[in-house]
Amino acid sequence: MQVIVALAALSSLAAPALGFSIPRGVPVSQSMIDVKLSATGNSMVKATITNNGNRALNLLKFHTIMDSNPTRKVSIESEDGKEIQFTGMMPTYKEKDLKPSYFISLPPKGTVEHSFDIARTHDLSRGGKFTLKAEGMVPIAEENGTEITGAAKYHSNELHMTIDGEKAASVENAFGIVKRGPRSRITKRTSIDMQSCGNSQELQALTAALKASAQLSSMSAQAVSQNQDKYMEYFKDPQYMQTVQSRFQAVAQESSSTTGGGTTYHCSDTMGGCEEGVLAYTLPSQNEVFNCPIYYSDLPPLSNECHAQDQATTTLHELTHNPAVQEPFCEDNGYGYERATALSAEKAVQNADSYALFANAIYVGC
């Protein structure tokens, strides 16, 4: 098959694969940590995280309420029940060789506080009454360690805030984003920002990753109905098969060209979001994707290892975050194999990494 041959040729260039996340079979606790939200200003929120256990823990900050990047930490609904648009970043982090600085150490019964301004990542200019809550799963290492040994789910209290819209509008957005009109969706294929490509190697790598993303997504769309056991492993419920298949088809189409479409893909970081450990990130409110330096230096083009990260599936992951590809766009509900496969069907079908991991599994034969 031509697609398999092309992908095999690309994977032959791969460096050793990168794996992660919560190792298979590690315990997931429902009550190990507690998260309480409180308002400390017009749009300022404080999260107080408490270790309920009797041993010290190292909590990984990535994709949690403690993330220092302008990520979605809380869901926000207006008084009429409508979700407020998120204007921050959705990063993909490197999952191997985690550094101590990526963790927060919490002694038994100890607490740590993390404050953030929700106006930096949400349009709250209308003002009024809003309801906030946070939920997620924190990977955990033992005291002074960086090897993930477990995870803790958290569900915060509901926080009700009355926000002054004018004051909220005066807060600078994390990426200086201003409102734009809707993008044309006549041709749904990505466009590479050539000016962001500092050298031919970056452009070549991104072009190859998009091609592989298109091929992997096409294979995965077919596998949804042809490999139902694998589908159920990642997405749990047959009623979502059409939704999953449609998203893979949309990603395949979006990845199939580099000269025009609903998303803009940047070879490099032109918005300043590439903090340490970030491979790539998406601004879903703008339908833009940005690669970081370690996307090129630390990832193989295409991995032959199960549950591993590579350039192709990272690009596929990022494209699912864009509403121009398919709405509603995917969130980061569960990152890595163990967390992704622990999600409910409703969460999995809207989880970016579930699609990347499924594509990897179909290609590798996991």
UniProtKB/Swiss-Prot annotation:
CDD domains xrefs: M35_deuterolysin_like
Propeptide: 20-189
Cofactor: Zn(2+)
Reactions this protein catalyses: Preferential cleavage of bonds with hydrophobic residues in P1'. Also 3-Asn-|-Gln-4 and 8-Gly-|-Ser-9 bonds in insulin B chain
PANTHER family per UniProt: NEUTRAL PROTEASE 2 (PTHR37016:SF7), PTHR37016
GO cellular component term, pick one: extracellular region
UniProt-listed Enzyme Commission number(s): 3.4.24.39
GO molecular function ontology, one term from the record: metal ion binding
Family: Belongs to the peptidase M35 family.
Residues holding Zn(2+): H317, H321, D332
Alphabetically ordered keywords of this record: Cleavage on pair of basic residues, Disulfide bond, Hydrolase, Metal-binding, Metalloprotease, Protease, Secreted, Signal, Virulence, Zinc, Zymogen
Active site: E318
Gene: NpII-B
Signal sequence annotation: 1-19
Disulfide bonds listed in the record: C197-C267, C274-C292, C306-C366
PROSITE patterns assigned to the protein according to its UniProt record, in alphabetical order: ZINC_PROTEASE (PS00142)
Cofactor binding note from Swiss-Prot or TrEMBL: Binds 1 zinc ion per subunit.
Keyword Thylakoid included in the entry's annotation: no
GO annotation terms (biological process): proteolysis
The name this protein goes by in its record: Probable neutral protease 2 homolog B
Record function comment: Probable secreted metalloprotease that shows high activities on basic nuclear substrates such as histone and protamine. May be involved in virulence.
InterPro entries per the UniProt record, alphabetical: Fungal_M35_metalloproteases, MetalloPept_cat_dom_sf, Peptidase_M35
Localization, UniProt: Secreted
